[in-house]
């Protein structure tokens, strides 16, 4: 992840160096709002001696959680008259949970299992923007970005009637991509209010566990995908 950002920040440094004397282009943004996180494609599979004896695709879950982040970027409009921006962005989001149940056959007996998945995603993106400058203080824009998504999954299973409560955790760094729209309002020459919407796809995270008892082998696998619809309000300061 560090190498990723070391490479991505080079264009910003070069652009800044080219216009350092004018002190124009660099900006920072802080933002907060609601992230509507979608947890989908949720699979839960139990197997015994390599034979699947219980598989379930759990219901998708969409939940609004608090989201926020910071960004540093370079606006090419003032120094170069190009209506584009390039920025590095970090956004965190609250936890989303998805619940369901499945029936399996364990050692010859039917068992119902309550399953709960908790997902949290943080993204580190390189975003590009195209600004539609006009004669007003409002500037609409479109955006697209790629980067890394750190997705954490906590999977809880409770076999009903057995007094067992087990939680497994895993995390994964995935390729992430996104696109969005928004508008900024210039309060002063240096301060802007930014309202935006972005869709971010964070990929898939999975968990697995194996248990051996003599000649018997039981296994459990779970996986889910995550995406977010981010509705943010931010304040930007341009240097």
Curated annotation (Swiss-Prot):
Residues 37-65, 93-120, 149-174, 201-230 are extracellular. InterPro entries: Bact_OM_Invasion-Related, OMP/PagP_b-brl, OMP_b-brl. It is found in: Cell outer membrane. Residues 1-22 form the signal peptide. It is a multi-pass membrane protein. Induction: Induced by both low pH and low Mg(2+) via the PhoQ/PhoP two-component regulatory system. Responds to general intracellular signals that are present both in initial and in progressive stages of infection. Pfam families: OMP_b-brl. The chain crosses the membrane at residues 27-36, 66-76, 82-92, 121-132, 138-148, 175-185, 191-200, 231-239. Keywords: Cell outer membrane, Membrane, Signal, Transmembrane, Transmembrane beta strand, Virulence. Residues 23-26, 77-81, 133-137, 186-190 are periplasmic. Its main location: membrane. One of its GO terms (cellular component) is cell outer membrane. It comes from the Bacteria. All four putative extracellular loops are crucial for invasion of mammalian cells. Haemagglutinin that facilitates the adhesion to and invasion of epithelial mammalian cells. Utilizes heparinated proteoglycan as a receptor to successfully invade host cells. This is Outer membrane protein PagN. It comes from Salmonella typhimurium (strain LT2 / SGSC1412 / ATCC 700720).
